[in-house]
């Protein structure tokens, strides 16, 4: 059974959305486990703030890269479909 571009694209999008949702859930769990700020020393408070920023930045960078890779794979898949079509139905 041949996979269409639309099926391939939709599957990549679904996987990306699912992965993003799971990553957001993990981040939410981490942030929920943070101690009450009133119990933290100024140094630890600063440490947590830096760590939270780092997690958010890395999450954004990772999601951007995943999106770029997905778009690249979609483009390559479309090219392969065109090559397959050209091989099956060569111009005369």
UniProtKB/Swiss-Prot annotation:
Keyword annotations for this protein? Calcium, Cell projection, Cilium, Cytoplasm, Cytoskeleton, Flagellum, Microtubule
In terms of InterPro entries, this protein maps to: KMP11 (IPR004132)
CC per GO annotation: cytoplasm; microtubule; microtubule cytoskeleton; motile cilium
UniProt superkingdom = Eukaryota
UniProt GO BP: cytoskeleton organization; defense response; positive regulation of cell population proliferation
Question: What subcellular locations does the record give?
Answer: Cytoplasm, Cytoskeleton; Cell projection, Cilium, Flagellum
Subunit: Monomer.
Please explain the role this protein plays, according to its UniProt record.
May be involved in the regulation of the cytoskeleton through interaction with the subpellicular microtubules. May be involved in parasite mobility and attachment to the surface of the host cell. Behaves as a strong immunogen during infection.
Family, according to the entry, reads as follows: Belongs to the KMP-11 family.
Miscellaneous note, as given in the UniProt record, is:
Binds calcium.
The entry's protein name is Kinetoplastid membrane protein 11B
Task: Please tell me the species this chain comes from.
Answer: Leishmania infantum
Organism ancestry: Eukaryota, Discoba, Euglenozoa, Kinetoplastea, Metakinetoplastina
Q: Which gene encodes it?
A: KMP-11B
